[in-house]
Amino acid sequence: MAGRGCSCSPGHLNEDNARFLLLAGLILLYLLGGAAVFSALELAQELQAKQRWEERLANFSRGHNLSREELRGFLRHYEEATKAGIRMDSVRPRWDFTGAFYFVGTVVTTIGFGMTTPATTGGKVFLIFYGLIGCASTILFFNLFLERLITVIAYVMRTCHHQQLRRRGTVARDNRKAPRKGEADSLAGWKPSVYYVMLILCLASVAISCGASALYTTMEGWSYFDSVYFCFVASSTIGFGDLVSSQNAQYENEGLYRFVNFFFILMGVCCIYSMFNVISILIKQTVNWILRKLDSGCFPQCQRGLLRSRRNVVMPGNIRNRCNISIETDGVMESDTDGRRLSGEMISMKDTNKVSLAILQKQLSEMANGGPHQTSTSSRDDEFSGGVGAFAVMNNRLAETSGDR
């Protein structure tokens, strides 16, 4: 965020580090706020439940002439049995093949309900290596799912955009004719907005949750609200384990129900994972906006310094040394805006954010590679030049990630 020549920016904190530290601080505040809210909502209920339990324990001890120590010892044995999968009600075996398949599914998807855990040393050792490969493979599967989902959504939205251009007369209706330059630019540079993609993923997640909740209400006997709650906890891979589907000993049409349950959980995890990654783009935009606001005080003098250094073709290193946020964003606003207008790229943001976010993302990639990309260095295969994980998947596929790392 700071660089030389900017007295209001302490140190040499570049854009990446500033974003990281700001996001870490915001997450810490988010955790503190969440802890305060949940403590206010749940603490009283916990104290009341504990008081009721102590009263029941005392009444049972007096009624059956048992000491509290003996009774607590018996309850500890019950807790150990519960951890081993023993329940008072009739439940299906935890470690038959279908139960083990359900378990490994919760392992590789990182849901981890916790109702089934390995008890043997061999099982625990095998879980470490099995989870290492399984979790990595499943994350790759989720990223590939996200890539194909974004591709399909972009294709559909691009087709709709093309139809709108045809209705407006911007694109020729005769597809046999070669498109004019303006027509090609208006289509080639067009990318779907992250907001529309997020809306589509949100609707898909809601549809899956509603359908699954109706199924769980019928088959598990849960309330509809508890079913919706379970769908989110499972699909987001939080996996508390307070509610777990497909655990009863018998179901009507058991085979079909277990298959549909597996399908709903898998599709729910894929959609929620994709939606989380799209939301992360919006969070990144917010962090960038905060950084620009924090750095706006030193914008005028830093921009003038950048423009002077850009005119000096003999010393391009001045640009890289002045790694102030305003330098990396606003200093090249005019030239990049013209380029984006010529390409016809649509970015669904207000004018103040339209260019600056894309410039931030472009400059991040340039700074990571030691400066603007040159012809001699562009041919090198850099595994991380396009980003890591889901950010790499969505790189240049959405309007708001054009030029992203």
Swiss-Prot record:
Selectivity filter 2: region residues: 237-242
Alphabetical keyword list: Cell membrane, Glycoprotein, Ion channel, Ion transport, Membrane, Metal-binding, Potassium, Potassium channel, Potassium transport, Transmembrane, Transmembrane helix, Transport, Voltage-gated channel
Intramembrane segments as residue ranges: 95-115, 224-244
GO BP terms in the entry: potassium ion transmembrane transport; regulation of excitatory synapse pruning; regulation of NLRP3 inflammasome complex assembly; regulation of resting membrane potential
Segments for region (Selectivity filter 1): 110-115
Molecular function GO labels: identical protein binding; metal ion binding; outward rectifier potassium channel activity; potassium channel activity; potassium ion leak channel activity; protein heterodimerization activity
Ranges in the topological domain labelled Cytoplasmic: 1-19, 146-193, 284-405
Tissues where this protein is expressed: Ubiquitous. In brain expression is rather low and restricted to the olfactory bulb and tubercle, to the ventromedial hypothalamic nucleus, lateral septal nucleus dorsal, lateral mammillary nucleus, lateral parabrachial nuclei, reticular nucleus and reunions nuclei.
Gene3D superfamilies per the UniProt record, alphabetical: 1.10.287.70
Compartment annotation: Cell membrane
GO cellular component, one term: plasma membrane
Principal location: membrane
UniProt activity-regulation remark: The channel currents are activated by arachidonic acid, inhibited by volatile anesthetic halothane, partially inhibited by Ba(2+) ions and only weakly inhibited by extracellular acidification to pH 6.
Glycosylation site residues: 59, 65
PANTHER family referenced in this protein's UniProt entry, alphabetically: POTASSIUM CHANNEL SUBFAMILY K MEMBER 13, POTASSIUM CHANNEL, SUBFAMILY K
Annotated function: K(+) channel that conducts outward rectifying tonic currents potentiated by purinergic signals. Homo- and heterodimerizes to form functional channels with distinct regulatory and gating properties. Contributes most of K(+) currents at the plasma membrane of resting microglia. Maintains a depolarized membrane potential required for proper ramified microglia morphology and phagocytosis, selectively mediating microglial pruning of presynaptic compartments at hippocampal excitatory synapses.
Note on domains (UniProt): Each subunit contributes two pore-forming domains 1 and 2 which assemble to form a single pore with M2 and M4 transmembrane helices lining the central cavity and M1 and M3 facing the lipid bilayer. The transmembrane helices are bridged by the selectivity filters 1 and 2 that coordinate the permeant ions. Up to four ions can simultaneously occupy the selectivity filter and at least two elementary charges must translocate across the filter to convert it into the open conformation.
Protein family per UniProt: Belongs to the two pore domain potassium channel (TC 1.A.1.8) family.
Assembly and binders: Homodimer. Heterodimer with KCNK12.
Name of this chain's protein: Potassium channel subfamily K member 13
Name of the gene: Kcnk13
